[in-house]
């Protein structure tokens, strides 16, 4: 994950830690998709980091919901532990310098 974050330097990014079994996670996914579609051509990146689920379940959910942003698997919850995530969903915004600009716990909303 750190290598991946390093590769994002120069781009604004949303890193969202989530799970398919989490109702607030499921509720915010359409808003995240909307933001991704609106800003991806401007270099905005979304990384949905799934916590402790298998690839088949995540792929099925992403396809069912027509989510097109990248999803990464954190099967052992190492990313969640590294960023001290205690509740899902948790979202982190990185600025173009690669610095954490904002952390949101609970739900993202489009404003």
Stretch-by-stretch model annotation:
Residues 1-13, 36-39:
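A short beta-strand-turn-helix
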Residues 3, 8, 17-21, 61, ...:
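Conserved hydrophobic/aromatic "anchor" residues
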Residues 6, 23, 33, 52, ...:
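Nucleotide phosphate-binding site architecture
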Residues 9, 17-34:
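Conserved redox-active cysteine motifs that mediate thiol-disulfide chemistry
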Residues 9-11, 41, 67-68, 85:
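Active-site acidic short loop of glycosyltransferases
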Residues 14-15, 46, 91:
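Hydrophobic beta-strand anchors of alpha/beta hydrolase catalytic cores
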Residues 26-65, 75-82:
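Structural microenvironment flanking redox-active thiols in thiol-disulfide oxidoreductases
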Residues 60-68, 73-111:
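Thiol/disulfide oxidoreductase modules built on the thioredoxin-like
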């Amino acid at each position: 994950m750190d290598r991946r974050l390093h590769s994002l330097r120069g781009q604004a990014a949303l890193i969202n830690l989530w799970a398919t079994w989490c109702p607030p996670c499921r509720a915010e996914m359409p808003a995240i998709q909307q933001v991704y579609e609106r800003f991806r051509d401007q270099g905005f990146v979304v990384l949905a980091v799934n916590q402790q689920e298998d690839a088949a379940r995540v792929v099925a959910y992403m396809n069912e919901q027509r989510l097109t942003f990248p999803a990464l698997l954190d099967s052992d919850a190492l990313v969640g532990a590294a960023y001290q995530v205690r509740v899902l969903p948790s979202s982190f915004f990185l600025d173009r310098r690669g610095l954490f600009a904002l952390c949101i716990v609970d739900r993202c909303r489009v404003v």
